[in-house]
Amino acid sequence: MSLLDTLQRGLADLDAQGLRRVRRTADTACDAHMTVDGREIVGFASNDYLGLAAHPALIAAFAEGAQRYGSGSGGSHLLGGHSRAHATLEDELAAFSGGFSDAPRALYFSTGYMANLAAMTALTGKAATIFSDALNHASLIDGMRLSRANVQVYPHADTAALAALLDASDAETKLIVSDTVFSMDGDLAPLAELVALAERHGAWLVVDDAHGFGVLGPQGRGALAAAALRSPNLVYVGTLGKAAGVAGAFVIAHETVIEWMIQRARSYIFTTAAPPAVAHAVSASLKVIAGDEGDARRAHLAALIERTRALLRNTRWQPVDSHTAVQPLVIGSNDATLAAMRSLDAHGLWVPAIRPPTVPVGTSRLRVSLSAAHSFDDLARLEAALIEASEAQAVQKAAA
């Protein structure tokens, strides 16, 4: 059988299981109201939690950065591509979210995937053991596989199970790794307990705050700041394409850790640096996030979250107990979840269907992603459409 035959058979299998992914094409800027595939929709799919992706100040900064630095960086960070915009942003990020360390330093990456690969591979090796939450992001898992470290997976958020694994380990280097906000359930990691376990066992704790940075904590400084946690053995990863509304990611840790990553993190060294204009726009985003406007947007988002938690309970499906902008609604089968997504789409609402392998088999769900750009009228439309779709499925199930 040829490679093409194998791939075509694989695609047919995905179709039969309701697992093929389909891209949709946005014709306008990312916002609560946008044009997608030529249709006006209300989007509940993006991670633009503060509604900054189309903010005039960020757009102006992007244009200013392109005018000053050009359209591309021209090289890797170690071979001519590291600009003043990158350096300034790293200093700003360390000052903004590095309060957990006495000597914080930040390192800017082009994507969150690359930042997580760097943290997993540069800080470990064959003599290390990584202790990973079962629901960690795929980029962390891929980084662990590349690291050559021994990986032990503990049940989701189960600190007792983690403690038992740590007690039994004699590894030279121990790394506890966890998302802060879990992207498909919206729940929060037990960060205080994880920090305590790391300190008790001489381990390091790496946290991926992709869905917390900009939203959680005072001024949006992130999940560690929200929990008022400090420790010398922390490595903090954040992304800049979600709440920050631009692109890229960063790692903050003790300055020695960051210097080592500059020397050894392959996903930092062997790639062209992001355009300086992107970093310049992120600097503008940090000003909005940290200011009064950022506080107002977070307050509005918090109100939207509470309203959404209530309205999801009015459906026939199973909401997940989330207090974050990620609000999942578990339906179960792939076919039923896709049918629900199509029903919402007919009402001009874009709510993506999340299926295996992203979530466990039998837990396919709608993932409602909230933004400060949404209004309560948007939520009223969502509630009506969800109730209609869930009632229709209940009737069909009863008649079957």
Curated annotation (Swiss-Prot):
The keyword Cell wall biogenesis/degradation belongs to this UniProt entry's keyword annotation: no
Pathway: Cofactor biosynthesis; biotin biosynthesis
UniProt cross-references to InterPro entries, sorted A to Z: Aminotransferase_I/II_large, AON_synthase_class-II, AONS_Archaea/Proteobacteria, AONS_Proteobacteria, PyrdxlP-dep_Trfase, PyrdxlP-dep_Trfase_major, PyrdxlP-dep_Trfase_small
Required cofactor names: pyridoxal 5'-phosphate
Swiss-Prot/TrEMBL catalytic activity: 6-carboxyhexanoyl-[ACP] + L-alanine + H(+) = (8S)-8-amino-7-oxononanoate + holo-[ACP] + CO2
Keywords: Biotin biosynthesis, Pyridoxal phosphate, Transferase
GO biological process: biotin biosynthetic process
Keyword Transferase carried by entry: yes
MF-aspect GO terms: 8-amino-7-oxononanoate synthase activity; pyridoxal phosphate binding
Ligand binding (substrate): R21, H137, T358
Pfam families in UniProt: Aminotran_1_2
Family note: Belongs to the class-II pyridoxal-phosphate-dependent aminotransferase family. BioF subfamily.
NCBIfam families, per database record: bioF (TIGR00858)
Protein name: 8-amino-7-oxononanoate synthase
Species assigned in the record: Burkholderia lata (strain ATCC 17760 / DSM 23089 / LMG 22485 / NCIMB 9086 / R18194 / 383)
